Amino acid sequence: MSGFDEGNVTVSGGGGKGGFKKNNGFVEDTSVRDLFKRFINEWKDQDNVFIYKEQLRQHYNLGWHYIEVSIDHLTDFNQELSGRFISSPNELMPSFEDAIKDIIKEMNYNKEQVDEDIQILFKSSANPEPIRYLRAGLISKLVKVQGIVISASRTQPKPSTMVVKCKNCQHTQTLHIRPGIVSSVLPQQCERGSNDAGKPCPNNPYVVLSDQSTFVNQQILKLQESPETIPTGEMPRHIILSLDKSLADKITPGTRIKVLGVLGIFEGGGKRREIAGGTIRTNYLRVLGITSDNAGRDSMHFTPSEEQSFKVFSRRQDLRNIIASSIAPSIYGHEDIKRAISCQLFGGSSKKLPDKMRLRGDINLLLLGDPGTAKSQLLKFVEKVAPISVYTSGKGSSAAGLTASVIREPSTGEYYLEGGAMVVADGGVVCIDEFDKMNVDDRVAIHEAMEQQTISIAKAGITTILNSRTSVLAAANPVYGRYNDAADDNINFQSTILSRFDLIFIVKDPKNEKRDFIISKHVINIHEKSSRSGGSGSVGNNTYDLSNTVVDDSHIGENEVTIQYLKKYIAYARSRISPRLSEDAVTTLKNHYVSVRAKSKEQEMINNGSYGGGGSKNSVETERKKRKNAIPITVRQLEAIIRISESLAKMSLSPIATNEHAKEAIRLFDISTFDAITTNNTVNETLTPERLENIRTAEKYLKDRVPIGSSIRIKDVRFQLSRSGLDHFTILKAVDILVGRDEFEFRNQKRTLFRKQ
């Protein structure tokens, strides 16, 4: 092998009937063929079953033209053959395929020729090679890599044997196209030279006879390093995968896989190649086998001693307190938020209904509050300890970057699908900071991903559905930066997005001398300890790979556990426990939901009724239609409490979510989401006729002073109306009513009032 994937076409005589195959000077090795044939026929498992011979027979009878072979078995059978295959797979693959054909001929006595090639798929237990460390020394060798598929092309036909005919003399020949990413170059000169009349054949005389050629399916994937394996500060690396035959159309973006293949190179297109004079080559992997990689989806291996330690730990009375204390221990306070985050890490139980519908078990969490309350630090901590996680900022995220996009390849003009953050984080957590800074249209794009946990794409002729089984942990600031106790001045999100969050926490920074003293002391202690230890004092730059780490009771402290122990305990609980509600818990949750709905209705009636006592009837009716709770109470909130109850049961390794778990879930819901609802509906003052008259005066003033299509600053409105003797509440109420009627709208983060009609 020369290193470059050249010599793409091999010729086998005239007439298109096969002949002797040349493969870059390699002559077919009959000893390799016979040896591999013996391996398929003679290899037995522990039950004395000829597994490969039986597998080949079953697959061929079912019309499945492939066989899966373990390289570990091949090594045990003949180490020299295995070693030669690993170092020179391209040379041995034709002999292996011919050996399979021979075996099928022996199985089918009435058939002299096998109609279709049998694809050999390989698997290995060897450790994968990092994508960023694939170097020139591995070219043309068998390598194993792992990562996440971020894009996939459409499957297209690729010729394996191409029959061509000269337009002048009708001479035909068969071209054998090598597998992988290669270009099919037709001969420029006719071998015969002239026709029967002596007329010479021109240059480039051949045309392809498609009806006599054979084709295989080929698909191109892009494999990227898993987010948790990328070193801090480094860009993720990727490699192109070439899949053919039975492997095509099996993998979608967002899937984590381990790939066994031959490292090759092809000519890269675009400006880079032009600048380098055509010498640039791009790595790719010709795939010989794919296995699903569930390492991020809680598939760690646990020793018996670890399982025993987990069971003992789960029976501790202070289990929830210990786990909550282990969530971002460097951050003071926020005990209930940490409990909610621990529930999110454990997750509820996903369910598949008889009608094929799926109910999500992942928990979504929103932190809304003042700056400096450690919201971003909590997100960063979760990003580092979750098995799969993606951290992004709302300002720098687009709808396509979060969900999926259809990209056009510049060199070929072909469209392919590329998954975004919520596809890459399938099975983990997406942390979105500055959630309030996102464009409204971009937030709408993640509605389906947050509830149905799928992403539907219908662009550029590509129609598909991608999995997005992720939890969302988002952090946002109120409208004016800091939380304002006045009504409707804080949450500026649509109810459609808010209803998809299971828990919504209002995080305030109250000015309390005693609390400020405790926090300052805590922060200073952290800095002092960090200085003495000479380290960063946090897990911020570490990614814990626990697949080969054994944890024991030494990782359990008096008030908290180590990150290693917590992460492995979470993986154990998620993989082994799928709780269901007890009868008592069902009754408790049902009664609570009915009660909360009644309270929400009462609160809404109070808000709507606050416009009563006189005034225009149409104005009152308009307000009743327009003004609703920012955070609605729907069936989604009932499902949220169910998921939290299940996560609390999973936390204690209990298969049943009891009444006690349900009560704790209700408590978390009441102090978060329901508290946020009542906090944002604090205006329940009954308006007197005098107050209503003042509101109408303010409305008339604004309509007279602001022409349609013009704006006025809220600061100027307050200043001018206050000079007329109107109080702050009356001014805000008048503005709020005008906005509710859709006559005015807020702009520039509620600093400007624009008149629409």
Swiss-Prot record:
Motif segment (Arginine finger): 499-502
Location of region: Disordered: 606-625
Keyword Zinc: no
Biological process annotations from GO: DNA replication initiation; double-strand break repair via break-induced replication
Compartment(s): Nucleus; Cytoplasm, Cytosol
Catalytic reactions of this protein: ATP + H2O = ADP + phosphate + H(+)
Name this protein carries in UniProt: DNA replication licensing factor mcm5
Gene coding for it: mcm5
